[in-house]
Amino acid sequence: MSPPRPESEAELKKIEKNERRRKSYKAKREASSYQKIKDEIPEIPGWLMSNQLGKQLEASDKFTMLVEKGEISVIDEVINQGGVPVLVEFLATGDTAELRLIAAQSLANIARGNLVQTQVIIDQNGIPPLVYRLGTGNDEIREMAICALSNISYHSTHTREAVIDSGAFLELWKLLKQPFEPRLTILTKASLALANFCRGEPPNKTVFNQIRQNMPVLKQLLLMTDKQVATNACTTFSLIASKADMIQAVDEAQICARMIELIKKPMPECFEPALLTLAEIAAQNHVSAQAVISAGLVFALVNSTRAESDFRKDAAQAILNITNNGSPEQILSLVNDGCIPPLCALLTCADPMTVCICLNGLRNILRADQARKGMVEECGGMEKIAVLQHNENTDARDIAVEILEGFWPEKIDWDHYLN
């Protein structure tokens, strides 16, 4: 039976007033509780290092909450009071699983801080016991160890190499090669760690060689239905696709359709890495370009015109790469799919690099088939290009003038240039 409806406007106002009071009280109570925990920051390191499991568990929970809310000062408290070597010892030789879990979680939290704070873990030889816990112990400890190693590797090439050189990647790779055996939360953390191992310059040869030799493993992660795992795999593909010795393996993995699918869902987290990957594949050769076209690249471009500027630029770059390297038939296919209207629409965006990419794409299309002038005019592209000949950005201005000279010379403002 549904609850009775308010009988009068006065009753409705009273209900709304009480709801506002309830929310206000809840917010004040949460703020008061949080402030109390902040006041305990100087005590948390001592509780973590005590011999009382209850205190250690409480301190670990509070430590995690404070770090998640950006209270990085608590990390300095733990470091300054000598907590890191104690936590490393707990992780390596702790008597109970609870104690080892507390240690792994605390080290993961410290690695969420800055590079200087993370370096303390490395200096205190904290990486080896974290790697050891990847292959032993319960799933919760393994998950926290993965988090810690992932966080450490994210900070710099130096910290990444320290993690990989310790054997972390090979242990992690074992988990990823059997994606249906670990629980999903472990797979989520492991796929994120893999992406972090692929960041930075120069790339780590061991990681890239293993991925290249076992590309189906990464593709399997990309095909998974879990949103976060797929996003992490998509990010990894974007990081390796930009490398000359990896792009062929990425191309041969035949992932274009899946990348477009992730964009269509839509999954905003995947927009940028998916488009970056497609742009790299499209730049390879005619066969690769056709795979990207057939997957529905123009849809991604049209969809991106309503997205953030970075996404629009990446989608336009993929189109440009095909117009640079594709056959006349492939360029015609892009046109028939409807690429001209979104390219013209993006000529007025605020980002000059995106504008230049779109201008170059339109120039290539017109060079391939001058008969497409009418389509550009219908979309307002000609007028926008004419306006761009006065743009403050030198590159955009020069490309616009070149297009006008070749296809609409009557639109060039000669008085402006002669004066």
Model-predicted regions and their roles:
Residues 40, 78-86, 121-129, 163-172, ...:
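Alpha-helical scaffold repeats of the Armadillo/HEAT/TPR superfamily
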Residues 42-49, 53, 85-95, 128-135, ...:
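HEAT/HEAT-like alpha-solenoid repeats
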Residues 51-65, 95-111, 136-154, 165-166, ...:
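Alpha-helical solenoid repeats of the armadillo/HEAT superfamily
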Residues 69-73, 83-84, 112-117, 126-127, ...:
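Flexible helix-coil junctions and inter-repeat linker/turn elements that act as hinges
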